Amino acid sequence: ETDCFRSREYDEPRHIAIHPNNRYAYLINEKGNKMTYFGFDDVNGKLLPRQNLPTLPETYTGEGQASASLLDKNGEILIGSNRIHESIVLYRIDQETGYMKELGYYPAMGLTPRFITFNPDYSRFYMANEDSDTIIEMKLDSEQGRMEYTGRVIAAESPVCITFR
């Protein structure tokens, strides 16, 4: 049997990232502009909602469309992307409890950051900016909890997904 949960009206759940320990899950809500943390009861197969944090800055009053959620290799940093706000948000994950703490926002350096991913060895982070036809390369400093732009911009017509082989 598969567990299900009722999201808040108009939140529109979009992507979920599972922590490497398989006990925590992080769901980004497209219209609600929230990241929801769930504990996962793997014995009973239940998702237990525990925390909601905004994906947009508190002072931002415009519309938003959250698009993707992604964890770093060790499950220490959670990243969410915001399409209309043209940004990403970083959260630190408490490894004992799974709770999130907002670390800050970074400009997407382009329009409509639709997809985010790491390269296979997690040394670089990539953001596909659909409406500016660019892929932005960044480097995550997990220890400090911040992103650094590498200066590399890859031209790509309307990128919406990135895969590595």
What role is predicted for each listed range?
Residues 89-137:
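C-terminal hydrophobic structural anchor segments
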Residues 2-56:
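Acidic, glycine-rich loop-and-beta core segments that form the ion-binding/anion-interacting portion
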Residues 7-23, 55-75, 109-122, 153-165:
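Beta-rich, blade/repeat-based domains predominating
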